[in-house]
Amino acid sequence: NLERNAFYEGVEFPDDCDVLISYAPPKDESLVASFITQYAVTAYASQRYLEKHPISRPDELEHHSCILIDSMMIDDANIWRFNVAGSKEVRDYRVKGNYVCDNTQSALELARNHLGIVFAPDKSVQSDLQDGTLVPCFQQPYEWWLDLVAIFRKREYQPWRVQYVLDEMLREIRHQLAQSQQLRPEQAAESED
């Protein structure tokens, strides 16, 4: 779990760490951040929450109980970014809420229990979307794309075995991502028939 403000100030790299997979850039500029993939993040809530507290656009989030992520805290709020639907323009929205979580999984659990709106990666909520536990808050595709990176020390400061493990790990992650993106769920279902 990232420390408070790590998303905006950069993530600390522990001395006993060889590789750190993160959506936040490193705080120390002497570290390397190798791009792995991008993923979309948007707002989700339970149908029950949305029936009681309707929302249609990100600028309405200020009137809702948003489930905050500790690493994204600025004072008593999070800044959630969304691309303006149909454009590449990005806008920031300051959101507040009754709950602060140190990871997305606990934030998702609160949202599943009708306690607010969660800002989560689309891949993290696929099963919730399929079974109707969570639904997107917006009809239009308001989302924010984040980079997933592997952070490590420059190669000249690493033992050979760490370089080897890092190269193999990144190769395998990229290979699995490429495979998962080749077959969308509906294609996978068709190929099983």
Predicted feature locations:
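Central regulatory/effector-binding core of bacterial HTH transcription factors
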Residues: 1-29
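Alpha-to-beta junction loops
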Residues: 15-20, 41, 112-117
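Beta->alpha turn/N-cap motifs
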Residues: 6, 23-25, 45-47, 103-104, ...
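Hydrophobic hinge/microswitch elements
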Residues: 89-136, 141-143, 158, 162, ...
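Short secondary-structure boundary/capping segments
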Residues: 11-13, 32-35, 57-59, 71-72, ...
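Flexible hinge/capping segments at coil-to-helix
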Residues: 30-41, 45-71
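C-terminal effector-binding regulatory domain of bacterial HTH transcription factors
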Residues: 122-131, 140-193
